Amino acid sequence: MSQLMHFSRRILLATIFIASACLPAAAQTPSPTPSTAPTPPPSDIYIVDLKTKHNYQTHADEMRLGDPKRITDFAGYNNQPYFMPDGKSILYTSIRDKQADIYRYDIETGATTRVTNTPESEYSPTLMPDRKNISVVRVESDGTQRLWKFPLDGGPPSLIVEEIKPVGYHLWIDDHTLALFILGASGKPNFLELYDLHTRKSEFITDNPGRVLRRIPNQEKFSFVQKIAPDRWEIKAFDLRTRTSASLISALPGVEDYAWLPGGILLMGKESKLFAVAPLQGKSWSQLEDFTVPGLQGISRIAVSPKGDRLAIVARPSQ
């Protein structure tokens, strides 16, 4: 059963969480203040074309991947890719001059533009349901970590939810409902909750979630990784109608980053390999590709274009 109003679990932490796909999957990077925050390990973003037989995306053995193309030329942290609805550009986080800002890459022209340029740090860019703003996890000047929005037309940013902190990651369910990864207090586990912007009420879902929250294609559900034990991580589905969770499939060992294709296939990466599975068909993970591109190793985050014809893959560059 869900537990409502877990406001007692939220406090302003002196340490905050910065997302780093290049750390071990369970790791978190504390940063007492933006000025003293350690820089996450470097990472690059690649885009890869995805083709399927007869345009179906329900069978992994019918998929073919093109050659990866690196879209980030800045040596440092380039992470958290997010495809815009038209599939023509990608938002991502990049740390430059010790500050994390949001950038936008145009796939057709290859041009990169800066979206945010603030003294604070912004992470996890996501287009809001109104399609006029992007929401971000913002590390404020005092280290507070909350959800903000930036207008796409360049207007001033504003808080989305004042009282919820510290936010690690988020997913828009609809125009007034959010799934939120909340950092636990000292000695307490991180937890996952739903938050209603209209009622200002929270609904507790589970402890120890993974950082990736995704809508499941063509279902009234969203997915998350449940870290049940150090050696047992499962991808679960939360049913928005029944308010219950059910296991879909075990995650690859030590991996918490994943993505859905529109046809219902799950993707996960490990080292230089990309794996796929159709969990609703009761199948197991199979290797889809082993990339041989120099520098493409340590795959972590994966994003899928709206049509499912292109992937954005985060990888660790060669040392």
Which stretches of residues belong to each language-model region?
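Sec/Tat signal peptide C-region and signal peptidase I cleavage site
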Residues: 23-27
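Bacterial N-terminal signal peptides
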Residues: 12-22
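Sequence signature of WD/YWTD-type beta-propeller architectures
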Residues: 28-319
